[in-house]
Amino acid sequence: MQFIDQACISVKAGRGGDGIVAFRREKYVPAGGPSGGDGGKGGEIVLQADSNLQTLLDFKFKKFIVAQDGRRGGPNKCSGASGKDLVLKVPCGTQVRHQTTGIILGDLKHHGEILVVAYGGKGGLGNAHYLSNSNRAPEKCTEGKEGEQWLLHLELKLLAEVGIIGLPNAGKSTLMSVVSSARPKIADYPFTTLIPNLGVVRKPTGDGTVFADIPGLIEGAAAGVGLGHEFLRHIERTRLLIHLVDAAAARPIEDIAIIEKELFAYGHSLMNRPRVLVFNKKELLNEQCLQKLQAEARAFTNRDIIFISAATSEGLDELLKNVWEKLEI
């Protein structure tokens, strides 16, 4: 399935139905009188969060969305039927804003949560409303109002408590596949992961925590190089970051600095987000190299440092224990 995390759509709520001019003509109503009914209200356009959806793909080809108009009024003061509301399902984590003003209309985070993005027009009034002592047979009625029409920008920001970040080929997908039920694509070349992957990791209590494997970031990501800016938005909502580093890389400390620089450049308080520094592929280094790397990392940062092997599962218990403790703070 193609992963689409942004969409621009035009929405138009239904127009209100017109009121009508009508009069009582029954022979048993000798006085007659106006009986024109009101028009029905136009249908609204509603967005609803659905936890079964993971992408905005449905809106890739659905660019112009129109709700049903209200029906015109009828005789005998019968109101026209209101237009049917149009409910559009979106993934949990979808933020909605006006395309032109940038104003955020809402943030749909929880399953079933709804947001009305375009209100239907009011129905017009029938001539029964204009009966007065001076006008016993009014010929006046009003038209229904147009429904609201907006250009909206939908943006999906994944809802995960823990984000796994790092340069390409650091082993993020392998780690995700080991600690969760997710099965991301894994291969020994950079940029294997091209979309964020979500997985549920079980705590010792049995409760689930959502982890997000963010595709590999590169230098300049915060400025839009590669797809970095597209991916960085998905860690805005996380409570904790696992910064995964390839311990066997040529310059692992420089690799750490690259990601730190991108987090700072992107902003959104990512630099202040709690995180743990994790060196992966420890099985490829001897004890002397591991100690040297740990000393260099200690000189670079005061964050918790953990060495693991996602391939052999060594160190994963220590990592998850650290994660659970940080999430409890």
Swiss-Prot record:
It holds the Pfam family MMR_HSR1. One of its GO terms (biological process) is ribosome biogenesis. Mg(2+) binds at residues 173, 193. Its cofactor is Mg(2+). Keywords: ATP-binding, Cytoplasm, GTP-binding, Hydrolase, Magnesium, Metal-binding, Nucleotide-binding. Residues 160-328 form the OBG-type G domain. The keyword Lipoprotein does not apply. Residues 1-159 form the Obg domain. ATP binds at residues 166-173, 191-195, 213-216, 280-283, 309-311. GO terms for cellular component: cytoplasm. Signal peptide: none annotated. It is found in: Cytoplasm. Its EC number is 3.6.5.-. One of its GO terms (molecular function) is magnesium ion binding. Belongs to the TRAFAC class OBG-HflX-like GTPase superfamily. OBG GTPase family. An essential GTPase which binds GTP, GDP and possibly (p)ppGpp with moderate affinity, with high nucleotide exchange rates and a fairly low GTP hydrolysis rate. Plays a role in control of the cell cycle, stress response, ribosome biogenesis and in those bacteria that undergo differentiation, in morphogenesis control. Monomer. This is GTPase Obg. It comes from Prochlorococcus marinus (strain MIT 9211).
